[in-house]
Amino acid sequence: MSSHIHFQEKITHTDYEIKMISSGDNFPSIDISESRLHYLLIMIRSCIDIQSIKKELNWTTIELDRHINTLLKEGLLKERKGSYFPACMVITAHEGKELYNLCEPLITPTLQIIEKHSKQIITLCQKIDTFKQLSIETCSLLLYSGILLDFGQINNVENNYLKSERPLRNNKRYYYSIQEKEKINEEAFGIYGNHYLDLGEIQICLYGNKRYTTTNLITANKEMLEEYFQQPVLDVNQFKKQLVQKFVSSNTQIDVPLHLFYEKVGLHKDSKPMTPLFKTADLIILDEIASTISEDLITLFQENEQYLKRYYLSSSYAKEITYEEFFIWWYHFFYTKVTDELIKNDIIKKLDQENQTYLVLQ
């Protein structure tokens, strides 16, 4: 028997991440990874014949038809002239490299935009207590990547450049992507992202590109907490909330085990707090910080629109998704590449923890 691995077998032996941009209750009614439906979408896109797909996924004809209908109903698959196409952005390793290459002409102008507004950015930072208590360097990944380019900027990009609503899928509006994952300890394509755990009046947030492979307060589970503190944990979120309340309260005596735990999950470094703590009023100033570069960034995208659309129209994405959906996922590659350049230029100081934990108090 040949040792050659069929293409469809290679797909099922590759790791993928499902990414989504949504708000409120705008999300799919199904988890496509649970039923291996992401493999079906990738194989259809790779022009693998139906019989080979059935064989590889070990489905009957009835099961395959049911799964196809599920994806059609969900708006993640579409049919045109008897052929099926994914209706979300599937990004293979090869396409990821192309998307990074596509960023190149925009990187230097973006670094210049940030430099142009750097004094204004620092002035605004000085209005926020946590930036006075911690050095800007300590918070630089969150500030220059998260706030300036990623979650602090993306609404501006949608509203003022794309000027369109998110795609409507089964009465829900959201962006959706399946991304090939090459590195075990890093998120797909090394893309930076934001994650938060809402505990009522406290939000624990985490920014970085190794959020799910590092020890942090969001991913800490029941077993880890019980093993570390040697006590039963009945309600994980309530326990985390109490840990954060002790961290926030300046008059609480912190014992050695708790202090070491704060170090372990990235709240402390070298015995000192290193976690930004934002109050509700600070969020308005964070918006102002993001807005410093907004206009110039939108102009840059408008000036490069034909360049970006040429790639889009020449790719398979043109028959699968809108330019707007293509752009928003490309934008993630773009701000990640800008972030990596800012790290190289020592504007962003890389932390030992890889990610930046921060807290928001309502």
Give the ranges of each region predicted by the language model:
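Extended alpha-helical scaffolding regions
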Residues: 101-206
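Short amphipathic alpha-helical interaction segments
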Residues: 57-74, 78-79, 249-264
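N-terminal helix-turn-helix DNA-binding core of bacterial DNA-binding proteins
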Residues: 36-59
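Minor-groove-contacting beta-hairpin "wing" of winged helix-turn-helix DNA-binding domains
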Residues: 82-88, 270-280
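Conserved hydrophobic residue
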Residues: 49, 53, 77-78, 267-268
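Short, amphipathic alpha-helical interaction segments positioned at domain boundaries
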Residues: 89-122, 277-309
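Short alpha-helical segments that sit at the start of domains
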Residues: 7-40, 199-237
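Short capping segments at the starts of secondary-structure elements
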Residues: 45-52, 231-253
